[in-house]
């Protein structure tokens, strides 16, 4: 039986708050992948999240406010995921993170930020079956967007 889980690195800053995280979580729970996941672990840095508010989105969501220091970046979440993978080698893990939150909301990059998040979700969430097949051969699978300027 497939064992799968999702680890989300969330950085919460005053400008975006939890907007991108909520968008990502709602996207996840509206897709078939939610039935494959045993849990969704959100590891947050920066402004603490309202844990009951986020966990009430879906019963599989668990939130930890790891640190108020956003400059720790993704490292704590990657370490948590690494430790989990060592203890549970049969799990397939999806890693997502709140992209673009350091950019101002009203800047010219607002729409590219949303498309950046959408591309990550499309490649890993919408195409999860392909990712799971590839994980039978490879240790990691991900996406890489390359723009021609």
Identify the function of each model-found stretch.
Residues 1-149:
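ER/Golgi luminal nucleotide-sugar-dependent glycosyltransferases, focusing on the catalytic module
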